[in-house]
């Protein structure tokens, strides 16, 4: 215990602490951990769903930072026109191709026809089967079609020469195994 002088009186503090010094660092660590965790979740939300992130944080400075990062990401990483470059008055569809292929290949979009075709096929699938409700009749037809596809057909019989070649290969493998094993009598008995 260390005595400390305060206005002519002596106060004794356990553990030798001075007047005015903080107690434990635990509350500071808890607050710091909470802030870091919150920032981490906001960072993950930004990459998971950019629009929700923008709606949650309506700060103009954060919006400008997001716009700059999105423009950089579109130009440098994805090599496509910026998704925020279109005016907000234009109607945007929820299709993949309208989001990814904003312009033809000559304007900086995808110049790979296979990639363009793949995106178009995903877009067709998404607009026809996932995002739109189907009628009961269409659902029944699709269910019947999928059940017909799941019927297993028996395999076609193999030609006799293939069967004979397979039997000969198995017999040769067994003979080689018997020849190279130390315990060939026991292996022969089990076969």
UniProtKB/Swiss-Prot annotation:
Membrane topology qualifier: Single-pass membrane protein
Q: Which residues cross the membrane?
A: 28-48
Where mainly found?
host cell
Presence of keyword tRNA processing = no
Localisation: Host membrane
Q: Which UniProt keywords apply?
A: Host membrane, Membrane, Transmembrane, Transmembrane helix
Annotated Gene Ontology cellular components are: host cell membrane; membrane
Full protein name: Protein UL140
- Which species is this UniProt entry from? Human cytomegalovirus (strain Merlin)
Upper classification of the source organism reads: Viruses, Duplodnaviria, Heunggongvirae, Peploviricota, Herviviricetes
The gene from which this protein is expressed is UL140
């Amino acid at each position: 215990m260390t005595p400390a002088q305060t206005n002519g009186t002596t106060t004794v503090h356990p553990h030798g602490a001075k007047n005015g010094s903080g107690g434990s660092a635990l509350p500071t660590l808890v607050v710091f951990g909470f802030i870091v965790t919150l920032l981490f979740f906001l960072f993950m939300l930004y990459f998971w769903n950019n629009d929700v992130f923008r709606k949650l944080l309506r700060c103009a400075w954060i919006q400008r930072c997001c716009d700059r990062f999105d423009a950089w990401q579109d130009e440098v990483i994805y090599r496509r026109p910026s998704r925020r470059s279109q005016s907000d008055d234009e109607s945007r569809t929820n299709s993949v191709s309208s989001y990814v292929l904003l312009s033809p290949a000559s304007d900086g979009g995808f110049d790979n026809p296979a990639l363009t075709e793949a995106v178009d096929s995903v877009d067709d699938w998404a607009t026809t089967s996932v995002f739109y409700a189907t009628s009961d009749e269409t659902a029944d037809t699709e269910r019947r079609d999928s059940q017909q596809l799941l019927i297993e057909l028996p395999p076609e019989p193999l030609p006799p020469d293939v069967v004979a070649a397979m039997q000969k290969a198995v017999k040769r493998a067994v003979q080689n195994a018997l020849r190279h094993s130390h315990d060939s009598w026991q292996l022969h008995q089990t076969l």
